[in-house]
């Protein structure tokens, strides 16, 4: 059985604790070791009068049972005084239970200003004042638990309680924001809507029902939510009579009611009303960003369905010269250099793991077929988007805080080299006017020398900058494609880690939105979100694994549309449909069902067009002649070499960064053997080296040990055996 929940040493402030729910909370906390401040003004349920007896009786009751408590008789509007009592008596404040409340029930037309104001002063402003007084102390100690008290009247409304309902729902909004702001300091805030007998409810509920709704049936939930082991934050719970339920918002998919070249009308709203109110496929937004984040998806649907935005006023459109004049502008060229370390770091950042043996080729430079993940191509090009690059483009004047990464396209013309330096050239390909925003389309071309390696297209949506009279579509924009209307052919899932964004940002995307809780909070997120291009990398890796056996030479292109944010720790689920060489896919958060990447696809090179033994440039490898010669010369000295070497050497010869051929020199039995292909048994050491470097070793231009330490020669297995290369190649093979 799990250990009981204790509050030893925790200082708990309960407001309105002179009776009813507050009294039950105070007694329960004290019974489990808490040091309790029992606050009660001592008035009646209408907020009239004051006195000390209510709080004193509860304190006395706690002390009789061996607990520790002190009384406070101040109004919750004087929140500083309540918290000062806790600090002066016990030296800290750990838990605040905002429970104090009164009623002034009137039908709406009979509510006076005083009836309205006093309800808000006690419930909403009182909760604010007490919590604010405790907030900084909780931040300094990096710990706090806050409980807000709402009501079914606030959630659903109730006749005769307009003042009370408004205040109680306001408390929920206050809690939701405090949960976001307090998370980074281990301050959790939750809300309950209790059904219990009290001084307030005894006037509106039958006596037998009041008895059934005992405060003791609410207190256990309060204690759990306020315990240090409870990770719940920002929750809303109804509770009463021994029952507890959690509430959440739900939203219909809704309907787009704008038609091309027609004004948006109330008739269009009426005609779509059934769809607007249809909850059969509802979403459940949890953050303000999830609530507003679908705007990009809506705008793309507007385009694809032939619907256009319409101005809601007769104001003249903004000048077109600025945005239009930016089209065709070339940004300064730049170089992106990287080593195997950056390639591996990226692979880990998008979920590659040693737990999956097939991922080893992406995370271990000594792997025989070590490769860059194809989507590393976006890292090469992303400098064009960093460091305010767009801000230098003449005519582009907008608030960059309102810029969203809408879509991404990447095409590879050959596999990315495992390391190297690429020169990148970026140009503003087009700018589209979406009415409520503008889409900036930027093309980035990456070259190795004069050879084009990859091409990226970034589509950036800027909220609120549209309406300048520009064109809405462009043949230059790589089109997103809807997924087929049938069950997926394959589904893969990967759980992201809580450190996923922190790891991915090491690949060069330093946006504080993905690491800084304060910055994320200002942007409307409850915590830092995962990079969209990190989700992009996870998804592409799933497709490559499922339909190309992780063969990077088969990857041709990828197009995605970013729909919603992902939080580190959530599970990414990629749903895939195969149609010829195109793999359509969409990516969801498994826990919520939210689509986070939509209208996406990967184009693959046909498997029949892939050669595993010859380099892409064609032609014979020089090393093949050398291995043939070694085989011939060892015939006369093979037994002697076997005695000295006693090992099986497997060679992986690379060309253009990929394995072009495998050879085995078996010096473990008989007179030895040289043959093309992997070792028939197990190799003692595997050596990875390019065809060019192999020839330099053979001709004595490159020392094997120096090649190893410089990274030009890699070995796995018993790497000490690589020291015998000189003996094999020179002393015996006479090369």
Curated annotation (Swiss-Prot):
Q: Name one GO cellular component term.
A: mitochondrion
Tell me which residues make up the SCP2 domain.
623-735
User: Positions modified as N6-acetyllysine?
Assistant: 46, 564, 668, 706
Q: Where in the cell is the protein located?
A: Peroxisome
Gene Ontology MF: a single term? protein homodimerization activity
* Entry annotated with the keyword Oxidoreductase: yes
Which EC number(s) are documented for this chain?
Answer: 1.1.1.n12, 4.2.1.107, 4.2.1.119
- Catalytic activities: a (3R)-3-hydroxyacyl-CoA + NAD(+) = a 3-oxoacyl-CoA + NADH + H(+); (24R,25R)-3alpha,7alpha,12alpha,24-tetrahydroxy-5beta-cholestan-26-oyl-CoA = (24E)-3alpha,7alpha,12alpha-trihydroxy-5beta-cholest-24-en-26-oyl-CoA + H2O; a (3R)-3-hydroxyacyl-CoA = a (2E)-enoyl-CoA + H2O; (2E)-octenoyl-CoA + H2O = (3R)-hydroxyoctanoyl-CoA
Q: Which positions carry Phosphothreonine?
A: 265
* Pathway this chain belongs to: Lipid metabolism; fatty acid beta-oxidation
Q: Where is this region: (3R)-hydroxyacyl-CoA dehydrogenase?
A: 1-305
Active site (catalytic residues): 164 (proton acceptor)
Q: PROSITE patterns of this UniProt entry?
A: ADH_SHORT (PS00061)
Q: Tell me which tissues or organs this protein is expressed in.
A: Present in many tissues with highest concentrations in liver and kidney.
* Pfam families the UniProt entry points to: adh_short (PF00106), MaoC_dehydratas (PF01575), MFE-2_hydrat-2_N (PF22622), SCP2 (PF02036)
- Which residue stretches belong to region Enoyl-CoA hydratase 2? 321-621
Q: Which residues bind (3R)-3-hydroxydecanoyl-CoA?
A: 405-406, 434, 509-514, 532, 562
Family label: Belongs to the short-chain dehydrogenases/reductases (SDR) family.
Other facts:
The protein is found both as a full-length peptide and in a cleaved version.
What this protein is called in its record is Peroxisomal multifunctional enzyme type 2
């Amino acid at each position: 059985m799990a250990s009981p929940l204790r509050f030893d040493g925790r200082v708990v402030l309960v407001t309105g604790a002179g009776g009813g729910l507050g009294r039950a909370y105070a007694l329960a906390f004290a019974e489990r070791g808490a040091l309790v401040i029992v606050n009660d003004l001592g008035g009646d349920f209408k907020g009239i009068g004051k006195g000390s007896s209510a709080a004193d009786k509860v304190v006395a009751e706690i002390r009789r049972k061996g607990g520790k408590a002190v009384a406070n008789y101040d109004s919750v509007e004087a929140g500083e005084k309540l918290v000062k009592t806790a600090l002066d008596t016990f030296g800290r404040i750990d838990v605040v239970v905002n429970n104090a409340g009164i009623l002034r029930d009137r039908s709406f037309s009979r509510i006076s200003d005083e009836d309205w104001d006093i309800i808000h002063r006690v419930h909403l402003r009182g909760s604010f004042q007490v919590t604010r007084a405790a907030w900084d102390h909780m931040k300094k100690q990096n710990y706090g638990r806050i409980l807000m008290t709402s009501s079914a009247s606030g959630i659903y409304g109730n006749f005769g309680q307009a003042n009370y309902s408004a205040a109680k729902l306001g408390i929920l909004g206050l809690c939701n924001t405090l949960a976001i702001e307090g998370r980074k300091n281990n301050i959790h805030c939750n809300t309950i809507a209790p059904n219990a007998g009290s001084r307030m409810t005894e006037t509106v509920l039958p006596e037998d029902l009041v008895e059934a709704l005992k405060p003791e049936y609410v207190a256990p939930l309060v204690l759990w939510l306020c315990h240090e082991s409870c990770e719940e934050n920002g929750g809303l719970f109804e509770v009463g009579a021994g029952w507890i339920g959690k509430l959440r918002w739900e939203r219909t998919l809704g309907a787009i009611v704008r038609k091309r070249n027609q004004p948006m009308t109330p008739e269009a709203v009426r005609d779509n009303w059934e769809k607007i109110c249809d909850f059969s496929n509802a979403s459940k937004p949890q953050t303000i960003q999830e609530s507003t984040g679908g705007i990009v998806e809506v705008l793309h649907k507007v385009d694809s369905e032939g619907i256009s935005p319409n101005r809601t006023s007769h104001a003249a459109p903004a000048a077109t010269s600025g945005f239009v004049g930016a089209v065709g502008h070339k940004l300064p060229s730049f170089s992106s250099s990287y080593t195997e370390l950056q390639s591996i770091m990226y692979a880990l950042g998008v979920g590659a793991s040693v737990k999956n043996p097939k991922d080893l080729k992406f995370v271990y430079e000594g792997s025989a077929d070590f490769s860059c993940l194809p989507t590393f191509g976006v890292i090469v090009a992303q400098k064009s988007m960093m460091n305010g690059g767009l801000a230098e483009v003449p005519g582009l004047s907008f608030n960059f805080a309102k810029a969203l990464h809408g879509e991404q396209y990447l095409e590879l013309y050959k596999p990315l080299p495992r390391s190297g330096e690429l020169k990148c050239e970026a140009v503003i390909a087009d700018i589209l006017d979406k009415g409520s925003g503008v889409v900036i389309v930027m093309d980035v071309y990456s070259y190795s020398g004069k050879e084009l390696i990859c091409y990226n297209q970034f589509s950036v949506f800027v909220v609120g900058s549209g309406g300048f009279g520009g064109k809405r579509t462009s043949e230059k924009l790589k089109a997103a494609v809807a997924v087929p209307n049938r069950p997926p052919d394959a589904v893969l899932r990967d759980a992201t880690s809580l450190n996923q964004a922190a790891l991915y940002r090491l690949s060069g995307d330093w946006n504080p939105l993905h690491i800084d809780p304060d910055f994320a909070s200002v942007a409307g997120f409850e915590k830092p979100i995962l990079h969209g291009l990190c989700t992009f990398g996870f998804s592409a890796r799933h497709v490559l694994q499922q339909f190309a056996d992780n063969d990077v030479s088969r990857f041709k292109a990828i197009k995605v549309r970013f729909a919603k944010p992902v939080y580190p720790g959530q599970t990414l689920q990629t749903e895939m449909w195969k149609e010829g060489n195109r793999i359509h896919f969409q990516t969801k958060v498994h826990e919520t069902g939210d689509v986070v990447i939509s209208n996406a696809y990967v184009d693959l090179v046909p498997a029949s067009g892939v050669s595993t033994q010859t380099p892409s440039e064609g032609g014979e490898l020089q090393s093949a002649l050398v291995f043939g010669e070694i085989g011939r010369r060892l015939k006369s000295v093979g037994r002697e070499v076997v005695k000295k070497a006693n090992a099986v050497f497997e060679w992986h010869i690379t060309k253009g960064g990929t394995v072009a051929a495998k050879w085995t020199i078996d010096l473990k039995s008989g007179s030895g053997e040289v043959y093309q292909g992997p070792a028939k048994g197990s190799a003692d050491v595997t050596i990875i080296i390019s065809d060019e470097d192999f020839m330099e070793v053979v001709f004595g231009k490159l020392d094997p040990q120096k090649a190893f330490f410089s990274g030009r020669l890699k070995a796995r297995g018993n790497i000490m055996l690589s020291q015998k290369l000189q003996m094999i190649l020179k002393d015996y093979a006479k090369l």
